């Protein structure tokens, strides 16, 4: 597994010793100097965690989902003003991509937190959550689109609105379950990689608690912590 150069450039730029009041060094027209700055120790933590967790996540992936592409790529999302966040997606070839925002890297206090977050995102891929979410979205779109057709008598605007609403509801229907599933498997991945998932899950206490919102995308922090504790006790 190779860490993309974009990660190296982003992290090195982020921990630059240049004071904010000074003009940043020239880094080329296609590279933006991030507004969020992280320390040298945090940069080192990221590299250690990525190099430690990725092989374990890949092994889990090959064991549980051998038909998937298990070659994880780790990148940094340099979107200006992006809040602390991490997410899993796929590139055009189906390769799994785990992205961290610089704000999250600055917020994480130790390697255990970084390891748990990365393991959680890897678990989303291993468990096939993107495909399952898309399937739910299609089902919701077909259902509400069909109802809109019947109720409106075939109005294109009504059908389009029904399809869009149905897709959104369908995608969110099981999203909380997906997050808890990823927490459970992420706990196992982080622990196998040598990290403390309970310590890593302390990150939950420093982010807003979504509570139990109807059609919310994430479960309450208490439910997530309980899942981590339950799985950790089984290890």
Locations of regions flagged by a protein language model:
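Metalloprotease/metallohydrolase-associated module, dominated by Zn2+-dependent proteases
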Residues: 153-199
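Peri-catalytic and regulatory segments of divalent metal-dependent proteins
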Residues: 17-139, 193, 213-215
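Post-HEXXH active-site segment of zinc metalloproteases
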Residues: 130-160
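Sec-dependent signal peptide recognition
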Residues: 1-8
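Extracytoplasmic/secreted envelope proteins and their assembly/folding machinery
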Residues: 43, 47-54, 101-102, 111, ...
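Long, well-structured alpha-helical subdomains associated
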Residues: 173-175, 192-235
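C-terminal motif of bacterial Sec signal peptides marking the signal peptidase cleavage site
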Residues: 11-14
């Amino acid at each position: 597994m190779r860490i993309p150069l974009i990660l190296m450039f982003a992290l090195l730029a982020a921990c630059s010793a240049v004071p904010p009041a000074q003009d940043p060094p020239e880094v080329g027209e296609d590279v933006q100097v991030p507004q969020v700055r992280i320390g040298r120790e945090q940069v080192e933590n990221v590299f250690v965690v990525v190099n430690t967790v990725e092989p374990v996540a890949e092994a889990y992936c090959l064991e549980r989902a051998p038909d998937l592409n298990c070659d994880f790529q780790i990148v940094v999302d340099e979107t200006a003003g992006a809040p602390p966040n991490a997410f899993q997606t796929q590139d055009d070839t189906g390769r799994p991509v785990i992205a961290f925002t610089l704000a999250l890297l600055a917020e994480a206090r130790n390697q255990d937190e970084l390891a748990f977050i990365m393991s959680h995102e890897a678990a989303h891929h291993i468990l096939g959550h993107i495909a399952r979410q898309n399937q739910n979205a299609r089902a919701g779109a077909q259902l509400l689109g069909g109802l809109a057709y019947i109720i409106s008598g075939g109005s294109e605007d009504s059908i389009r609105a029904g399809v869009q609403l149905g897709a959104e509801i369908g995608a969110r229907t099981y999203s909380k379950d997906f997050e808890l599933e990823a927490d459970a498997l992420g706990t196992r991945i982080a622990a196998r990689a040598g990290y403390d998932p309970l310590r890593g899950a302390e990150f939950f206490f420093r982010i807003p608690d979504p509570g139990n919102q109807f059609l919310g995308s994430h479960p309450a922090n208490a439910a997530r912590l309980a899942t981590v504790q339950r799985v950790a006790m089984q290890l």
